[in-house]
Amino acid sequence: MKRISILGVTGSIGTQTLDVLRFHKEDFELVGITANRNIELTMDIIKEFSPKYVAINHEESYKKLVDLVKSQGLKCEVIYGMEGLVKVATLDEIDIVVTSVVGMIGLKPTVEAIRKGKDIALANKETLVVAGELVMREAKENGVKILPVDSEHSAIFQSLQGNAHNKIDKILLTASGGPFRGFTIDDLKSVTPERALKHPKWNMGQKISIDSSTLMNKGLEVIEAHWLFDCPYKDIEVVVHPQSIIHSMVQYTDGAVIAQLGVPDMKLPIQYALNYPNRQGNISEKLDLFKIRELTFEKPDLDTFKCLKLAYEAGEKGKLMPTILNGANEVCVELFLNKKITYLQIPEIIEECMNTFDYNKEVTLHNVINLDKEVRQYIYEKYN
């Protein structure tokens, strides 16, 4: 039996991870969880799974949960803040950590978990975007497996199994194109948060839904793929595939292309990561090839969707430029959702930050966290 912690248990990936645990009740024990504000759902999870440790990152929610746990006689330790996140990620009794928190907050607990020798089921792509060099070095030094949960990176990971890494010609990273595929810049001027949140294929949280609509999500995935698979940026090609059936592909030097196909259901890559190297029973509907009428592929429109282009530029420049890109994007998404900026201002402000801040510094936890704070403060003061 594997013992696990889930960081971000009440979010989209966290709740779907719980679905996997319900399906494999005999295979996993949930030891620790973290959440932010959703105390009602957190209480339901505590009652169902009986985790020993619960970390809450929002102060008022933490106080409320402490009172609820005590009044109902539940046996779990409730911890507050970043200290709590790190504790849940580094518990002696766990084998693997599912990092499904959204954004920069996942970086420190992930790095500390790696240093404690915990395998990582990685759904928090920002961790590799801002500190990929550090994270992969620490993973290698500590003998830790980084198992991708993103459907695209899981597909690449599976397509690499049993093949020589040095025979890769290129990675083909698929994208649905999001809800605004085919739109012009003029079309995007009137985009509202409500429209941007409606993804055509995937059930996701708010932040990743906006990122998918701007193609920034794909840009972050390009940087993530660079670090996960030690692949140069010039050999990572984004392919728009609206049907979301092929989750990504690897082309080898002999011309062969190996792809992973499946229904668009995040429980599949979650299940694969948690059970690796084994494959377990089918948690989702199986792909019926006879129901697929067509599989189509397009090049992304980098002029209209500038975020993807900016992500490639940030990745190529390296050092702390991806930290600037990521921090600026997180704040811009927040401001857009709160209707403080327009949709087209998102790439404009990100590019402004990339041209404003010094990125040519060593990638350390200290430097990443400090620069991230500077970027966020700059945008809040100017645009909020």
Language-model regions, residue ranges each:
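Catalytic, metal-anchored helix/loop core of enzyme active sites in primary metabolism
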Residues: 1-384
